[in-house]
């Protein structure tokens, strides 16, 4: 974005307001970021695609056809350098010009000026564009009954510098799961489905290991993958989960059986209690029902290629919220920091292993895959309501601003000594778009969901089990249902992202955009694109409802 607006270089720092002394004592006294701590990270334009910038959409194998570096669209066109706030202070202190808006100001002991100048900086960076191998570690335990149905569990193993919290805190939980499952296998136990454990390399530079593996094996994964379960950093606190809403009921059932090590109650009950105290109004019904809602996933970890590119149901799970987390992506993400400020008793790594282990084992041994459609129906209905309301909000905002410009309100309150200030531009008023296709699709989805829930409840009443042949036919539909939420041509301006319900923001990065093709067109006031995308997204939702109808039909057969 900086380059698009004319910047020729970019220096990034983490302000102490975000995770430094504004939050608490800095390391080593406390856990927050000190003045020498710089936050590393990838500045690849991953909202276009993740993975190797030179091989978009294909695996980065030795003989893969590669783009030239200058032609890779995710590689930034300007130099970028992260520094600490201690190093940023003299640069910011030397800036002149007008004061920054209040929401741009941090916690450094200086007035925050916008510039330009009079300070000048010489930015010199060296780049190494050599190709180097990365190493994914993959372990496979074949299923005894359904070997062609795969449950995949992953966490990355690379880190910036020491990486005690990110990724090791999550990786050790996965390794312990794998060790325990290995002991079961040694005793003669066999899973029904194939279980794959993966430790991904190159996550930090751009989800390289997971993306290239997923792209290399794309056809196999679309055919055989059931669910991908991801974890990353982990620390003391509350259970958090995001992912495919068809897995929401399944996750709630599993975490009822995991005990929180600090409180001695289930991690579900603890998360529900947090929602009761701090949750938004629309979450209180979930809290009363003693359930947690899965968050929709954008990007930022290794679930991205599975969910967003291949349409494979995915989860991202972990614990956190109570540690002092100021070491992120720095040299201070060390063992010492972790044992003092993240998870001193190593209890929440055990909790993560127990949680993910339950999810893994229940998935690989389920006679019928645990996808349910009611939570997805509720979520999509909410997302459609949001984009309709967004359009109304944008229309009102434009009408209000334009009227104030006509009435010279901004001119009347303008401070003549602030010469940098200019009145905001006029806004294009949103037309009254036709959302009927989306609303009708939601109605179709609701009807299909209700029919499936009724049929499944009847088929399993009184503890009845489905005949094997019927269960197999049903599973074949359930495991690929998420793929019907994708579109082969992908999202506007980024065909790699094919999921029509969840995507990272094109301009906002990791954070999720739901119904992205419609929502982002509205946010950019591109009414023509929004009009074109509404029926396409509606058709995708109806296609998903069609898969539910197929599943219902299977349950109705004798």
Where are these regions (language model features)?
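Short, solvent-exposed loop/turn and secondary-structure capping segments
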Residues: 13-14, 19-27, 93-94, 149-151, ...
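Soluble metallo-hydrolase cores and metallopeptidase-like ectodomains found primarily
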Residues: 50-165, 179, 183-187
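Metal-dependent peptidase/peptidase-like ectodomains
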Residues: 33-99, 146, 202-339, 345-349, ...
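A conserved hydrophobic secondary-structure block that centers on an alpha-helix together
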Residues: 1-35, 144, 148, 158-160, ...
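Glycine- and acidic
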Residues: 119-123, 153-168, 194-198, 236-237, ...
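C-terminal amphipathic alpha-helical interaction region
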Residues: 467-558
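Alpha-helical metal-binding/catalytic segments enriched in His/Glu/Asp
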Residues: 1, 137, 153-207, 212, ...
């Amino acid at each position: 974005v900086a380059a698009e607006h004319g910047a020729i270089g970019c220096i990034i720092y983490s302000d102490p307001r975000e995770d430094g002394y504004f939050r608490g004592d800095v390391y080593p006294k406390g856990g927050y970021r000190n003045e020498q701590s710089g936050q590393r990270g990838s500045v690849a334009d991953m909202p276009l695609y993740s993975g190797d910038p030179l091989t978009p959409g294909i695996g980065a194998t030795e003989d893969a056809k590669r783009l030239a570096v200058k032609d890779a669209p995710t590689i930034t066109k300007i130099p970028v350098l992260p520094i600490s706030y201690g190093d940023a202070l003299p640069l910011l202190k030397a800036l002149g010009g007008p004061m920054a808006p209040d929401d741009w100001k941090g916690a450094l002991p200086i007035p925050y000026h916008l510039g330009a100048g009079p300070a000048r900086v010489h930015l010199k960076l060296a780049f190494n564009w050599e190709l180097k191998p990365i190493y994914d570690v993959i372990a496979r335990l074949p299923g005894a009954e359904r070997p062609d149905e795969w449950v995949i569990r992953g966490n990355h193993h690379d880190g910036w510098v020491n990486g005690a919290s990110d990724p090791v805190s999550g990786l050790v939980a996965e390794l312990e799961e794998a060790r325990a499952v290995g002991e079961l296998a040694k005793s003669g136990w066999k899973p029904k489905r194939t279980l794959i454990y993966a430790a991904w390399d190159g996550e930090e530079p751009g989800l390289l290991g997971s993306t290239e593996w997923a792209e290399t094996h794309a056809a196999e994964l679309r055919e055989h993958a059931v669910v991908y379960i991801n974890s990353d950093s982990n620390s003391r606190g509350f259970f958090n989960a995001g992912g495919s809403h068809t897995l929401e009921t399944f996750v709630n059932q599993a975490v009822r059986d995991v005990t929180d090590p600090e409180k001695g109650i289930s991690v579900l009950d603890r998360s529900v209690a947090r929602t009761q105290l701090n949750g938004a109004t629309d979450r209180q019904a979930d809290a009363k029902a003693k359930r947690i809602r899965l968050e929709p996933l954008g990007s930022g970890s290794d679930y991205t290629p599975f969910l967003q590119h291949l349409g494979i149901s995915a989860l991202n799970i972990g614990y956190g919220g109570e540690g002092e987390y100021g070491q992120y992506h720095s040299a201070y993400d060390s063992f010492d920091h972790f044992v003092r400020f993240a998870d001193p008793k190593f209890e929440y790594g055990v909790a993560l292993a127990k949680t993910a282990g339950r999810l893994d084992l229940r998935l690989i041994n389920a006679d019928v895959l645990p996808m349910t459609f009611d939570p997805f129906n509720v979520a999509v209905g909410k997302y459609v309501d949001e984009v309709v309301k967004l359009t109304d909000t944008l229309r009102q905002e434009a009408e209000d601003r334009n009227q104030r410009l006509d009435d010279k309100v901004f001119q009347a309150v303008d401070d003549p000594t602030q010469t940098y200030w200019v009145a905001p531009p006029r806004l294009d008023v949103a037309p009254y778009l036709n959302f009927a296709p989306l609303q009708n699709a939601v109605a179709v989805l609701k009807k299909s969901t209700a029919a499936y829930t009724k049929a499944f409840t009847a088929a399993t009443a009184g503890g009845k089990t489905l005949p094997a042949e019927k269960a197999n036919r049903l599973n074949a539909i359930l495991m690929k249902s998420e793929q019907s939420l994708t579109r082969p041509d992908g999202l506007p301006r980024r065909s790699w992202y094919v999921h029509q319900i969840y995507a990272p923001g094109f301009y906002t990065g990791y954070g999720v955009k739901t119904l992205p093709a419609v929502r982002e067109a509205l946010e950019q006031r591109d009414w023509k694109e929004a009009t074109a995308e509404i029926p396409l997204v509606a058709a995708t939702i109806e296609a998903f409802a069609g898969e539910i109808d197929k599943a219902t039909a299977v349950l109705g057969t004798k």
